[in-house]
Amino acid sequence: MCFPKVLSDDMKKLKARMVMLLPTSAQGLGAWVSACDTEDTVGHLGPWRDKDPALWCQLCLSSQHQAIERFYDKMQNAESGRGQVMSSLAELEDDFKEGYLETVAAYYEEQHPELTPLLEKERDGLRCRGNRSPVPDVEDPATEEPGESFCDKVMRWFQAMLQRLQTWWHGVLAWVKEKVVALVHAVQALWKQFQSFCCSLSELFMSSFQSYGAPRGDKEELTPQKCSEPQSSK
């Protein structure tokens, strides 16, 4: 199946229609992401959403508009068969995903530097989760509409791509949240071990002083909880 070369004006209208489907604000992006589930989907981003919505928009949305521009240029420069259109849409989908991944990494690296090693280690895994499924070679006849124009057909495919992207983004956010929570728990466990070590070291010093005849007195036994409490001056 080969589509005829489309007039420039038609392509401009197509690009405008595609851009209109994208969120245009931080609030709109949050609604777009959470539409496939509940508003808690992006809740773990916490103060980021309220701190600088303009930055969120710039990072997440500008890359999408740039990707649509590249797609528009490809479609305008040559006659497009269905395979080429679907391949270009697949590249567009990957570009969208890459933009989202870069935004997540930029946020956590800035707001939580301690997460940088985790992100560097897990980033490849994050991208693997985002790998798109192969684009089908044959479209389901039930989805075809008689007399459908090239632009209408591309718009229908683009809308289907956005639905897949929405579901994928929901999964990515859940995955990142899971990793962050796991890291916080690991840090808390290490901190408890450090407190226990400090208490054991204190007990060792006290025992050493006792062996030289220093009276222990009626001091209570140290515990990790006691070590973590602020000591009052006497």
UniProtKB/Swiss-Prot annotation:
Biased composition (Polar residues): 225-234
One family name in Pfam for this protein: IL32
Subcellular location: Secreted
Annotated signal sequence range: 1-30
Keywords: Cytokine, Secreted, Signal
Induction, per UniProt: Expression increased after activation of T-cells by mitogens or activation of NK cells by IL2/interleukin-2.
GO MF annotations, alphabetized: cytokine activity
Chain residue ranges for the region called Disordered: 213-234
GO biological process, one term: defense response
GO CC list: cytosol; extracellular space; membrane
InterPro entries, per the entry: IL-32 (IPR028067)
Tissue specificity comment: Selectively expressed in lymphocytes. Expression is more prominent in immune cells than in non-immune cells.
Function: Cytokine that may play a role in innate and adaptive immune responses. It induces various cytokines such as TNFA/TNF-alpha and IL8. It activates typical cytokine signal pathways of NF-kappa-B and p38 MAPK.
Protein name stated in the entry: Interleukin-32
The gene coding this protein: IL32
